[in-house]
């Protein structure tokens, strides 16, 4: 597969009271779009999570952060399949077979410079040194290698596509919560 991973931005949705919602369903839309080869918007991801979990999120309130299990169910509603990996090697091998990952991170801890969005740079300006629980996506192709998509990217201009990262950088990002990197991932496939 020779394609670039399109970001599904959570920024098009409500940010209220200092809370930016919808990273999980936006990342589910990104990963599912990749493996299914079709356009799935962040809004469709949000609707799929509501259908999968039965919970309608109140925007601007930290009331429904996504779990990886929620996102496995969300991907199923979107038409993809998702599972927990056996280990990090399973994550990498699956990526190289056309799967995508959803990765639960402590943003933007361990991010390389190219993976930090303009939104996050502004956020850090207001909250120096702060990190936050966050869902992201990753994929791999022959032409671009590993690609990392943070839904705080705008999805426009230079933030339209995921950024290229090395194997070491992706593993560091996935390790940002302090445990084994595969424990914070799900593998999304057809």
Identify the residue ranges that each predicted region occupies:
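Solvent-exposed loop/turn segments at secondary-structure junctions
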Residues: 18-21, 30, 88-89, 107-111, ...
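Surface-exposed ligand/attachment interfaces on beta-rich extracellular proteins
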Residues: 87-95
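Structural recognition of the beta-strand scaffold that forms the well-ordered cores
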Residues: 83-84, 101-105, 137, 147-149
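Active-site-adjacent structural segments surrounding the nucleophilic cysteine of cysteine proteases
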Residues: 1-65, 116, 129, 156-162, ...
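Mid-length scaffold segments of soluble, non-membrane domains
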Residues: 71-86
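Noncatalytic regulatory segments and standalone regulatory/sensor domains
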Residues: 1, 111-132, 137-190
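Sec/Tat-exported extracytoplasmic proteins
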Residues: 27, 31, 35-36, 75-79, ...
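Loop/turn elements at helix/coil->beta-strand transitions in domains of secreted/extracellular proteins
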Residues: 78-81, 97-101, 144
